[in-house]
C-alpha cells in the first residue's frame, strides 16, 4: 500500500513516511504469515498466490519476508519428500532470502527505521536471516550425507553467531525497558493491547511511538492500521484462512472415535484455542520472539545430535548445543499462533513420534537419577552445571517473552505426554483440511502402539484429495510402514508401488520394499499361516521387484549420488545374488535367509510398536521359516535374525532371554571385552547398520534389566555403539539416535 524506496541512495524519511513504512512492513508480515498458514491447511495454491500478489507491488524490503515465506513453504515440501529437486529448489530460495535479509537489515539501520517498541532497527531482518540460514543448513543435514553435514556447519555457525547478536540486543532492550519502568512507573514506549482511539490520539501496537497530530487525522493511515490489527486478530483466532471456528473441532483425545465427543452446539465466534496467545504483541515483535525461540531451539537440538567427531570440534570453540534447553525453547515457540509455532510443533512431533523416534519407548530413563531416588539435590553441582551453560543460554534465561508460564521440567521435556497430544489436537482443529496434521496424529497413535487406529485415521482421508503432493507421498509411505507392522503386506505393497508414479525419492527402495512384502506373504503361505491362492503371484512379484530394484539406480538423472537406502538396497541384492551362486539355486528367493521386511520394520521402529500378537508372528517367521539360505547357516544372516529376535523377546517381557541371545550370538562376532577393561572391535562391513545398532540395543537391555542402577553401564554400551564406526551405511539416522540416548543418560546421571 505504501512504498518509498527508489534508486540506489536511501532517502531521508519524515516520521509520517516512516510510520507508513512501519505499517506496511507489519502488513507484509501478516500477509506472509497468512500465506504460510494456507499451506499448512493444505491450500498451497492460495498461499503462493497471496505471496505473488504481494510481490507484484513490493520493493526489496517488502520482498524479503515473501521470499522467506516461499523458502519456508519449499522447505516444508522438501523435508516431507526428501526429493533432491525439491531440496535444491528450497535451498536456492532460502539462499536468496539470506541475501535479501542482509540488505533489508542494513537498510533499516541506515534509515533508523524502528518497527519495534523494544528492539533496534533491523532486528526482525536479523531473525529472517538466521531463519534462512538455519533452514538451509537443515536441508543439508537431512541429506544423510556426512559431507553435506560438514558443509551445513558453516551455515549453522553463521546462524549461531547472528542469533547471539540478536539475543544480546533483546537482552539490552529488556534491561532498558525494566529500568525505564522503574524510573517512570511505566515503560516509556508503551504499546496498547488492542487497536483503540482515545480522543485525538491514536494508538497502534504496530507503531512504536505516538503519532503526530497530522498522522492522527490521516484517515488512510488509520484505516490501514485498523486493517493490520484485524488481520492479526483473525490470525490469532484462526479465522484468517476461511475455516469455521476451530473451537468446534477441538477434541480431548486422539483417533476417529474421539470425534464423537465434539460439542453438539456450534459456536459461531472465532476464539483463540489457548490462553497462551498474546494479543498485546505487535506483529513484528511476535515474529522476533517466536523466531528467536524456534531458531535457537532447533539449533541447540541439532548441535546436540551431531556426530561426536564434529561435535568435539564445535565444542572446542564454544559452539555447542543443549538438547534439553533446545527442546524447551522449541516448546516456547509452539505457544505462538504463527508458522514458527507450527514448525516448532512439527519438529517436536518428528523428535518424539517420528519414524526414527529419538526418544525410544524402551529407553524411558528418568531426567534425574537423584530425583528418581528421592534424594536431596546437590545444589552446588547444579550451580557448577549452570556455569557450563553457554552465553547464549544465559541470555535466553534473561528474556521475558511472556512465556514464563511454560516452565517444563526435565521429565516433561523427555516425556511430554498429554501436553504434546493437546498441542497436536489444537493444530488439527485450526487446520481441518490439512493431511499433514492428520498424518502426525496417525504417527502419534502408532507411537502409542495403536496401529489399527493409525491406519483407520489415514484411511479416513482420500489421498487423491490431498493438494500437497509431498504430504500425499508421506501419507502413503507412512501407511505402508504401519501396515507391515500389522503384517498386512498386500496393502503395504500396493501403497508403496503407487509411489513410483508420484514420488522421485527412491524408486529402488520402493521396489525393494514392495518385493519384500510379497516375499513375506509367499513365505507365510508356505508356513501355512496365510490362506491364499496367490502363492505363485507373490513368488513372481517378489522375485521381480527385489532383484530388479537395483535397475532404478542406473536411471537417476536428477541426483549425482545414491541415497543411503539406495546403497542399502544395492548391497542386499548383491548379497542375495552371491548366495544364489554359492548355493547353486534355481529360485533366487531361496537365496534370501532372514526376512528382509523385518529389517525395514526395524529402521522405522516397528518392533517398539507391534502388539504381542504381531511380535509373535514376527518371531515365528524369523525363527521357524526354512529354506536353503537359512539352512546354509550364513553367520551374517544369523546376526540379523538374532538381533531382531532379541528385540521381539524384549518387547515380550522376556528381557533376560533376549539379552542372553544378544550376548551369546551377536556381540561376540564383532566385539570383545578385554581383561584390562578395554574393548576390541572386529570391523565388519557386511551389514554396516547392524553392529552399532546391536551395541545400542544392548544398552537398552541393560536399562531394562538394571534400571537406574545400570545407567553407567548403559552409557558404556552407548559409547561403544558411537565409537564402532564414524561413517557407515545409514550412519546419520543410527548415529543421531545413539547420540540422543547418550544425552538422555548423561542428563539422568548428572542432574
Curated annotation (Swiss-Prot):
The entry's keywords: Cytoplasm, Nucleus, Phosphoprotein
Pfam families, alphabetized: Iml2-TPR_39
Membrane-crossing residue ranges in chain numbering: none
Compartments in which it is found: Cytoplasm; Nucleus
Main localization, broad class: cytoplasm
Entries under SUPFAM superfamilies matching the protein: TPR-like
Source taxon at top rank: Eukaryota
UniProt GO cellular component terms: cytosol; mitochondrial outer membrane; nucleus
Recorded family membership: Belongs to the IML2 family.
Main function: May be involved in mitochondrial DNA stability.
Name used for this protein in its record: IML2-like protein CAGL0G03245g
Organism: Candida glabrata (strain ATCC 2001 / BCRC 20586 / JCM 3761 / NBRC 0622 / NRRL Y-65 / CBS 138) (Yeast)
Amino acid at each position: 500500500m505504501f512504498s518509498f524506496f527508489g534508486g540506489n541512495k536511501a532517502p531521508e524519511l519524515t516520521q509520517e513516511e516512516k510510520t507508513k513504512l512501519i505499517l506496511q512492513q507489519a502488513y507484509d508480515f501478516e500477509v506472509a504469515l497468512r500465506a504460510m498458514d494456507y499451506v499448512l491447511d493444505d491450500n498451497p495454491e492460495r498461499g503462493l498466490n497471496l505471496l505473488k500478489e504481494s510481490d507484484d507491488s513490493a520493493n526489496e524490503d517488502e520482498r524479503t519476508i515473501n521470499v522467506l515465506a516461499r523458502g519456508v513453504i519449499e522447505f516444508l515440501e522438501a523435508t516431507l519428500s526428501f526429493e533432491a529437486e525439491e531440496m535444491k529448489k528450497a535451498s536456492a530460495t532460502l539462499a536468496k532470502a539470506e541475501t535479501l535479509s542482509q540488505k533489508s537489515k542494513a537498510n533499516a539501520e541506515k534509515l533508523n527505521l524502528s518497527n519495534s517498541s523494544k528492539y533496534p532497527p533491523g532486528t526482525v531482518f536479523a531473525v529472517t536471516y538466521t531463519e534462512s540460514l538455519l533452514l538451509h543448513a537443515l536441508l543439508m543435514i537431512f541429506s544423510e550425507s556426512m559431507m553435506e553435514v560438514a558443509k551445513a556447519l558453516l551455515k549453522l555457525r553463521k546462524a549461531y553467531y547472528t542469533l547471539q547478536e540478536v539475543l544480546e540486543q533483546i537482552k539490552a532492550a529488556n534491561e532498558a525497558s525494566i529500568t525505564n519502568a522503574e524510573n517512570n512507573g511505566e515503560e516509556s514506549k508503551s504499546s496498547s493491547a488492542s487497536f483503540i482511539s482515545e480522543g485525538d490520539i491514536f494508538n497502534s501496537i504496530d507503531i512504536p511511538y505516538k503519532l503526530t497530530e497530522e498522522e492522527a487525522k490521516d484517515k488512510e493511515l488509520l484505516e490501514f492500521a485498523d486493517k493490520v490489527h484485524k488481520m492479526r486478530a483473525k490470525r490469532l483466532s484462526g479465522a484468517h484462512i476461511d475455516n469455521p471456528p476451530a473451537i468446534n473441532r477441538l477434541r480431548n483425545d486422539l483417533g476417529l472415535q474421539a470425534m464423537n465427543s465434539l460439542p453438539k452446539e456450534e459456536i459461531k465466534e472465532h476464539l483463540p484455542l489457548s490462553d497462551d496467545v498474546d494479543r498485546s504483541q505487535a506483529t513484528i515483535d511476535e515474529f522476533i520472539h517466536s523466531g528467536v525461540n524456534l531458531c535457537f531451539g532447533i539449533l541447540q537440538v541439532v548441535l546436540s545430535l551431531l556426530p561426536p567427531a564434529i561435535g568435539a570440534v564445535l565444542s572446542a570453540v564454544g559452539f555447542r548445543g543443549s538438547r534439553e534447553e533446545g527442546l524447551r525453547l522449541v516448546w516456547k515457540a509452539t505457544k505462538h499462533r504463527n508458522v514458527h509455532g507450527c514448525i516448532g510443533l512439527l519438529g517436536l512431533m518428528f523428535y518424539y513420534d517420528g519414524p526414527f523416534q529419538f526418544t525410544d519407548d524402551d529407553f524411558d530413563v528418568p531426567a534425574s537419577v537423584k530425583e528418581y531416588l528421592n534424594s536431596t539435590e546437590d545444589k552446588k553441582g547444579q550451580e557448577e552445571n549452570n556455569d557450563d551453560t553457554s552465553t547464549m543460554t544465559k541470555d535466553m534465561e534473561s528474556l521475558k517473552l511472556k512465556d514464563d508460564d511454560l516452565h517444563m521440567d526435565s521429565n516433561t521435556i523427555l516425556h511430554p505426554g498429554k501436553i504434546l497430544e493437546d498441542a497436536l489436537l489444537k493444530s488439527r482443529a485450526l487446520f481441518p483440511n490439512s493431511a499433514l496434521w492428520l498424518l502426525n496424529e496417525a504417527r502419534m497413535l502408532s507411537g502409542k502402539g495403536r496401529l489399527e487406529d493409525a491406519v483407520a485415521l489415514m484411511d479416513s482421508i482420500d489421498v487423491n484429495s490431498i493438494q500437497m503432493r509431498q504430504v500425499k507421498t508421506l501419507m502413503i509411505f507412512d501407511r505402508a510402514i504401519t501396515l507391515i507392522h500389522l503384517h498386512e503386506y498386500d496393502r503395504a505393497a500396493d501403497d508403496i508401488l503407487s509411489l513410483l508414479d508420484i514420488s522421485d525419492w527412491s524408486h529402488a527402495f520402493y521396489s525393494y520394499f514392495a518385493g519384500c512384502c510379497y516375499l513375506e506373504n509367499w513365505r507365510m503361505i508356505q508356513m501355512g499361516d496365510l490362506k491364499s491362492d496367490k502363492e505363485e503371484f507373490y513368488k513372481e512379484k517378489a522375485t521381480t521387484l527385489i532383484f530388479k530394484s537395483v535397475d532404478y539406480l542406473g536411471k537417476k538423472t536428477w541426483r549425482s549420488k545414491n541415497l543411503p537406502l539406495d546403497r542399502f538396497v544395492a548391497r542386499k541384492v548383491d548379497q542375495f545374488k552371491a548366495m544364489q551362486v554359492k548355493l547353486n539355486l534355481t529360485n533366487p528367493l531361496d537365496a534370501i535367509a532372514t526376512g528382509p521386511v523385518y529389517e525395514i520394520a526395524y529402521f522405522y521402529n516397528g518392533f517398539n510398536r507391534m502388539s504381542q500378537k504381531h511380535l509373535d508372528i514376527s518371531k515365528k517367521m524369523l525363527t521357524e521359516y526354512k529354506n536353503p539360505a537359512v539352512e546354509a547357516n550364513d553367520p551374517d544372516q544369523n546376526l540379523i535374525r538374532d538381533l531382531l529376535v532379541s528385540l521381539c523377546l524384549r518387547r515380550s517381557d522376556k528381557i533376560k532371554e533376549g539379552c542372553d541371545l544378544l550376548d551369546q550370538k551377536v556381540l561376540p562376532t564383532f566385539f570383545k571385552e578385554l581383561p584390562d577393561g578395554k574393548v576390541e572391535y572386529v570391523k565388519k562391513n557386511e551389514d554396516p547398520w547392524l553392529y552399532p545398532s546391536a551395541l545400542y540395543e544392548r544398552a537398552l537391555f541393560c536399562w531394562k534389566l538394571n534400571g537406574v542402577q545400570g545407567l553407567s553401564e548403559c552409557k558404556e554400551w552407548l559409547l561403544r555403539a558411537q565409537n564402532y564406526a564414524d561413517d557407515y551405511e545409514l550412519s546419520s539416522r543410527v548415529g543421531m539416535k545413539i547420540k540422543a540416548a547418550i544425552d538422555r543418560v548423561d542428563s539422568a546421571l548428572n542432574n
